[in-house]
Swiss-Prot record:
Keywords: Cell membrane, Electron transport, Membrane, Oxidoreductase, Respiratory chain, Transmembrane, Transmembrane helix, Transport. The gene is soxA. The keyword Phosphoprotein does not apply. Its EC number is 1.10.3.-. GO terms for molecular function: copper ion binding; cytochrome-c oxidase activity; oxidoreductase activity, acting on diphenols and related substances as donors, oxygen as acceptor. It comes from Sulfolobus acidocaldarius (strain ATCC 33909 / DSM 639 / JCM 8929 / NBRC 15157 / NCIMB 11770). PROSITE patterns: COX2_CUA. This is Quinol oxidase subunit 2. The terminal oxidase is the component of the respiratory chain that catalyzes the reduction of oxygen to water. Subunits 1-3 form the functional core of the enzyme complex. Subunit 2 transfers the electrons from caldariella quinol to the bimetallic center of the catalytic subunit 1 that is formed by heme A3 and Cu(B). It is a single-pass membrane protein. It catalyses: 2 a quinol + O2 = 2 a quinone + 2 H2O.
């Protein structure tokens, strides 16, 4: 058997084996969950500064009274921000100038986005329904800053806004 006569068949078999190897490899990683995570790319708890993590732990273990969505813990404002159908709760956050802010962002219904332009830059993150996301920032200039839902999820999503009011 001359290899030149059967080069096309050999090439086909080699490529078929490679395709089967890569296909099997991907099936294995997808079926075991090793290649996909809903946390990938999302702002998670571990990405917060250590003091912010401690404040979130305290906030979670000592939740504020009903109707209260924020609490100052060790000089840091911790806000539980929830996105529901076409609104944010709360939709107004009042913070002192240069006061660190930690947002605990929840969305029980749909994927949402959070977009806030501050003098120091943009905070833009996504939130997957049912998975908590976190944001940490400090605004050093008084004023009103509007955040928006950056993920279009349906009718009136573009009107989902809120305001960070920086005083002092």
């Amino acid at each position: 058997m001359d290899i030149k006569e059967h080069a096309e068949e050999v090439w086909f078999i080699v490529m078929l084996v490679l395709v089967l190897i890569f296909f099997s490899w991907n099936v294995y990683y997808l079926s075991t969950g090793k290649s996909f995570s809903l946390d990938y790319g999302l702002p998670t708890y571990s990405g917060l500064p250590e003091q912010a993590q401690k404040a979130v732990q305290y906030f979670d273990s000592h939740p504020p009274s009903p109707g209260q969505y924020s609490e100052v813990i060790n000089g840091m404002l911790v806000v539980n921000l929830t996105a529901t159908q076409y609104k944010w709760t709360p939709d107004l956050i009042v913070v002192n100038k240069s006061e660190p802010v930690v947002l605990i962002i929840n969305s029980p219904q749909v994927d949402t986005g959070f977009y806030l332009r501050t003098p120091d830059g943009v905070i833009n993150l996504n939130n997957v329904a049912g998975i908590t996301s976190y944001a940490y920032f400090v605004i050093n200039q008084p004023g009103n800053y509007t955040w928006r839902d950056a993920e279009y999820a349906g009718y009136n999503s573009s009107y989902m806004t809120g305001t960070v009011e920086v005083v002092g």
